[in-house]
Amino acid sequence: MRAPIVPASSSNLHSCGRRARLQTKMNDSLRTLTLLPLAAAVSSVFAAPADDAKWNTLETSVVSATGYEQDVRRAPASMSVTTAEELATKPVTDIGSAIGDVPGVDIGLTKMGNSTISIRGFDSDYTLIMVDGRRQNVSGAMMDNGFNPTSVFMPPPGMIERIEVLRGPASLVWGSDAVGGVVNVITKKHPNEFTGSFTIEGLFQEHDEWANRGGTSFYLGVPVVKDVVSLGLRGRYNAWGKTEVMTPAGKLATHSPTEGYNENVGARLTVTPDTANTWWLDGDFTRFKGGSMNTSNQSIQSRQWYHKYNVAAGHEGEYDFGRTESFVQWNRLDKVKGISTPNDPTKSSYSETHGTFNDPLASSENFELSAKLTTPLELGSLGSMVLTTGGDAIYETFVNNQSTASVIEGVRLDQTQLAAFAEGEWFMNDQWSATVGGRVMWSDIFGAHATPRAYLVWQPMQALSFKGGVAAGYKTPEVRKLVDGLYNSSKGTDYYGNPDLKPEESWSYELSSTAELGGVASVTVGGFFTQFKNMLDSEEIAESTYKAINHGRVESKGVEVLVKTRPVWNTRFTGGYTFTHAEITEGADEGKRPNELPRHTLTARVDWASGPFTAYVKSSSKFDMAVSNPGNKGSRNAPKYEDYTIVDIGGSWTPVKNHVIAWAVNNVLDKDTAVFEKSGTSSWANIYSNYIEGRNLWLSYTYSF
C-alpha cells in the first residue's frame, strides 16, 4: 500500500500516497508500455494510408432518435455511437465504462464502484438504459446505499453491435425515464452462420490499495435452421478484490468497494417463418455482489447480493403498409442478502439478513407491454412522411421487507402507467424535414399529461446540416417518496416522504450544426437549454434527516462541440468539449447548483491502425465541480472539487485471423485522486469528486469466429 504523505504545498491535504521506493518489475513494464503508442503514432506518419474498411465512415445509422433506422445526420436528435470495435480496445466493466468517451456524458462512481451516467447536467435518474429498445431501468428505490443497478447489467461486449447515446429528452417515443437522454445497447441478432466470440481479461493495479479484477465472456450465434431459426447464447463473469483507500486518520475512505462479482447468462431464440415475420424470445439472469468497506462513513463494511431477472418475447413485421414492433417484458431486481460487519473488532454490530425469491429483502418488478407501427406515406408534390404510432403499458411494484422501521416496511407499492404516442417525420424535399408529435401518459396516481415535440432538420448540401427543436418532459415521483412518514433509514440517516410531491415537468430546446470538411473531418457544434418545473430532490430538515421536495425551477444550459476525422496516414482524431451550467432558479436554494457534475468536460482521442496493430491515446478532463454541502457530512470545506485530467493509452495486435490481443494502461500519468483534507474536527474529505484508480494494466485475449 502507498504510505500517506503530506504535499509540500499544503498542511491539511493528505494523499493516499506515492511510493518513495522503486516499483516492482511489473511497474517498470507499465512505464515501458507507456511509450508504445507514442512510438506507434510517430511511425504512422511514414506509413501508408490505412484501409478505410478498418474505420467507420462518417455516415452512421441509428434507431434511438425515432424508433426506426435512419442516418444520424438526419435524425431529429443529438446522438453519438460507440462501436463494437471501440469496445474491444478498452476494459468494459459496465455500461458507464463503455460510453465514458462520449461528449456530453458524465460518468461518476458510487461507493460500491458502480458507474452513474449523467447527460447534459442532470443526474443518472434522468437517463434511460435500454437493450434493443427495451427499458432496463428499475425503481429508483433500489438505488439506496450507492448501488446503481441500471448500469451494472449489460450483455457481454462480444454480443454488442453498437451503443447509441441520445443526448437530450426522448420521452415521446421512450417514456418518462428518458427526460435527460437515452443509452440504447444494440445487440447482434439472427445469425445465418455459426458465429461467436470468447474473451478472457484481467486488470492489474500498480498500487495495492486498488483492487485487481478479471473476467471472461462469450457469445454464440447458432443457425439451427438457416435463415429460419437461430439461437443466441451469452454469458459473462467478472470478479474483483476489495479496495482499501485509507484516510490520514488510518480509516477506510467511504469510496472503498468490497470484493464482488457480476455473473450473467442469457439466451435468445429467433424464428423467421417467412420474409414478413420475425418472432423472438429472450431470457436473462444476473447475480451481483458488491458493497462498501466503510459505508456512509460509519466504520461498517456493508456487502449486498442482488439477483436480476429479465424475460421478453416479441414480434417484428415487415408489411406493405409498414413495419410493426411489439413485445412484452418482465423485469425484476431482488436484494437477496445483506451483511454488515464493523471495522472495529471490539464492536459487535455484525448483522446478516437473507431473502428468497418469494420473500426478498427488497424487490422492484415491472411488466411492460409495448407496440409500435412505422408507416411510410407518399405525399406527392409535398414529399413523403414516416408516421410512427404506438403505445405502452407499464405496471411496476416495489416492496421493502428489510427492518428499517419505516412506514412502507412490508408494504407493496405499485403504479400503473399507460401511454400512447404519434409522431410524423415529414421529408419535404432533399433538404428539409420536420418532425412533430406528442405523447399522452396516464398514471393511476397523477392522472393524464401530454408532452409534445417538434424538430426541424435542414441539410442544404451533403456535407452540411442544421438541427433544432423543442421537447417537453414529464416524470412522476417514486411511489415510496409519496408516503407521509419515514420511508428509509440507513446507518443513522433518515429519509421522509412527502405526499404533496408533484411530477416534474420540463421543456428542452436545442440547436446544432454538423459540417463535413472535405470528407476528412466532421465537426458538430450545438447548444441546449432545459428548464425544469417542480424538479424532484431532497433537503436536509435536521442533522442526518432528509425530506423529499420539489424545487421551484431548475435550468440547465450548455454547449457541445464534437470533432471526428477520417484516417489520415493511418491516424484519426475524435474529441469533444461540453460546457454545462445547471442552476436552481427559484425557491429556497435559488442560485445553487443542483448537483456536483462538472461545468467543463474535455475529451480527446487519437487512434492509429496499420496491418495487425492498433494503438490509441486518450484523455478526459473535468473542471469546475461544485460541492453540494461544503463542510457537511464529510464533504470538503471548499465550494468546489479540484479539477483533474486522466490519460489512458492502449492498443491491440491480431497475430492471426480471429485472434486479438488487446492492452491498455489506464491513468498512465498515475493521477492520484484520493487526496484528503480536514472536514470538521474528526472527518476527512476527498478534494476530488471521484475516486479514480491509479495506474493499472489491462490485458485481454479474444477469439472470434
Where are the regions that the model predicts?
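Acidic, small-polar-rich N-terminal luminal/periplasmic segments of exported/outer-membrane proteins
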Residues: K54-E193, L511
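N-terminal Sec signal peptide and the immediately downstream disordered periplasmic leader
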Residues: R2-V92, A98-V102, T216, G221-V222, ...
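Structural signature of Gram-negative outer-membrane beta-barrels, strongest in the C-terminal barrel
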Residues: T272-D274, S384-T388, E396, S406-Q531, ...
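Outer-membrane beta-barrel translocator/receptor signature
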Residues: D144-F147, G158-E161, R167, L172-N184, ...
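Outer-membrane beta-barrel signature, preferentially recognizing the C-terminal barrel domain
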Residues: Q298-E318, S364, L413-Q415, Q459, ...
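C-terminal beta-signal and adjacent terminal beta-strands/loops
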Residues: S139, K533, F623-P630, S652-F705
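Transmembrane beta-barrel wall of Gram-negative outer-membrane proteins
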Residues: E209-G241, V245-K289, H307-G314, Y319, ...
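Gram-negative outer-membrane beta-barrel transporters
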Residues: M1-A3, T199, T375, F427-S433, ...
